[in-house]
Amino acid sequence: MEMTREQFFNEITELSSRGRHFNVSSSDIGNVNLYLQGCVIKANAEEGINGELNIYKPYTNMEVTIDFDIIEEITKQDNTYTLSFVNGLSDVDIEVIQ
C-alpha cells in the first residue's frame, strides 16, 4: 500500500509514542550494508512535509538521519515500511517490532 509522507509521519510518531521499536535495513547506505535491530525512531517534521527521520540504536553511537526531501515513495506491507529515494540510494525497510 502506498502512503503519503504525512501518513507515514503520523504512523511512525504514534508507534514511537507507544514505545515501539524498529528493525531498519538497507543493502546500501554509504556503501555499507545496514541492519539495525531494536531502533528508536523520532520524526521531526511539520505535518510530515519538511523535516527528517532520526533513527538510532539505544546504548550505541549508531544513528542514521534521513531527510524527508529525498524520500520519493513510501509503501507499507504488513508491519514493514519501505522508503524509496529520489537520489538512487537503495530502499530502506523499517519493520515494526514489539
Give residue spans per PLM region:
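Surface-exposed beta-loop interaction hotspot
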Residues: 1-2
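N-terminal helix-cap/turn-to-beta initiation motif at the start of protein domains
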Residues: 5-17
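A short, Trp-centered hydrophobic/proline-enriched beta-strand micro-motif
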Residues: 17-26
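Amphipathic, interaction-prone secondary-structure segments
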Residues: 27-56
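Structured surface patches comprising rigid loops and adjacent beta-strands/short helices at the edges
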Residues: 37-44, 60-79, 97
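Short, exposed beta-strand-loop hairpins at the edges of beta-sheets
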Residues: 80-87
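Edge beta-strand at a domain terminus
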Residues: 87-98
